[in-house]
Amino acid sequence: MKKEIIMALAISTTNLVKNFDGKNAVNGISLDVHQGEIFGILGPNGAGKTTFLRMLATLTKVTSGSASIFGNDLTKDGAKVRNFIGLTGQYASVDEELTGMENMIIFGQLNGLSKKEAKKRGLELLKQFSLTEAKDKSISAFSGGMRRRLDLAVSLITKPPLIFLDEPTTGLDPRTRGEMWKTIRELVKGGSTIVLTTQYLDEADQLADRIAIIDHGSVIAQGTPSELKNILGETTFELSLIKSSQIKQAKEMIEQKFNIEVIVLPEFATLSIKVTDTKIMTQILLLLETEHIAINEFETRKPTLDEVFLELTGK
Amino acid sequence: MDTTVINKNTTTMKTISLKSWLTDIIVMAKRELLKVKHSPEKLFDVTVMPIIMVIVFSQLFGGAIMGNVKAYLPLVVPGILIQTLVMASGAAGTQLREDLDKGATDRFNSLPISRIAPLAGTLISDIIRYIIAAVFALGTGAALGWRASAGFGWLLVAIGRLAIVTTWALSWLFALVGVLAKGAATVTTISSFLTMFLAFLSNAYIPVTSLPKWLKVIAENNPVSHLITAFKEVAYNGNFGHEAWLVLLISLLIVLILAPVTVLTYSKKN
């Protein structure tokens, strides 16, 4: 039974450490990535995201700790692990002088496909990524966004079940970024597991099923985007009243009855209340109703991932 | 047991064998050649350069050094050939550095290939560049009246068994420079300095007898001088003598020492 659970994990790391010149770039990361999910690794520049990814992609040696990829030990079975992974780095690493198809064939053959198979699969991928115009032309003639897409397409030539994307949209314009997101979502539909690093909160929020926030080489929070938002634990409940003359009365009543702090934003006759228990909101509305304080409108607001991030990293 | 999981995703499991190992190296070499196909200007240093060098040097210095151009050709043509080859061998380092900087090396290292393949591929595709260099340098020389007096067969021996083997060995030195240096520009600077030093402080352009004594000692012991002397001995006299064997021995030593060091540094770099 236990074995089955391990098998269902795409990645499992225990206390993974990478030391560079006496300093721990990755300082004991333990996490599990399930099959078929998009796992986001979020953190500021220099937090250790890329180093962590490089260890998992067998590019850099693990200093201590252990990790397994589909049940294969990362340090002992590196060669085998490389069959399961596709890597797209921070910079487009395809050969710009070469055509789209030539790049496909080279990477296909290096992955063990025959030239014919590589060609066939390359053609499929070029179509899938709307790159057919780059088939017989040097990549250097195309935009940065296209190069990134080709870079991603190339890493999919053998349909790897696990794909590492290191900051896949850094430096892309908003439109191309949107296209990249779409592509990434489609990959998961095909059954792949994706681990992506990003420093964009909205990217993690949009794409990731689960997120680990990394700072100074350690995981400081982990969970689904909404779980992380709940870390701050508060929903902001904002009420605006029709009569601004009643605002002081309303504030005092609510504070007394529920023993919570109410902030008054006088210019809009608005009360802002941070609530941890959503039931209080209904009770507040009922209280105001019985006291004949008419409400103009109200809204609730969850904290943004930005707020969570800033709170956690203390920046 | 892993297959139950992986099957879903139809992963191609690559079997590592001697054949796959060779294929990887050939594919990596092909990659370099495709680059040349798309940017033929990358062959400037092994085509246009040797043509110009042979013409300019023979016409410019022929009279001054040997009295006339024809008498200078036997000295300068092998000199320029070897100089071109030595300089061409420096390009390997720049190429490796560019791949490291661009992230291409990372990409390759995440593939199920032998880690030596990218390095070996680059160095093997270079051999084709060396052959091109030899054809252009010697072809220009021949057009001006230079002859390999021992005949075509011995000339091929001199090129294939001596000049190219030695240059290839030397390219490991520049590969190491490429792996160690900070950027592609640094590699080019270091390689140019080394190749200039090796080529000019030798018997490539002048008879060393004309040099001041201290310089003569340096020039005579320069490995490039040994190579040029050996080349002439084979191409002119049809004699693969002790000088030639000495040069091959030095080349073998260079490869035996530098190849493991370079490969180790290259994979340790991560």
What does each model-found stretch correspond to?
Chain A
Residues T276-K315:
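C-terminal coupling/interaction segments
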Residues M1-V17, G314-K315:
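ABC-family P-loop ATPase nucleotide-binding domain
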Residues S130-L131, N259-I263, A294-E299:
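A short linear hydrophobic-aromatic micro-motif
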Residues K182-V275:
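ABC transporter nucleotide-binding domain
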Residues N72-T75, V219, S244, V275-T278, ...:
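Short, surface-exposed acidic/glycine-rich loop or hinge patches that mediate macromolecular interfaces
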Residues E97, S240, K274, F298-E299:
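Active-site-adjacent beta-strand anchor residues
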Residues D21, A134, G144, I242, ...:
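Structured loop/turn residues at secondary-structure junctions
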Residues A10-T13, K18-D215, V219-A221:
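ABC transporter nucleotide-binding domains
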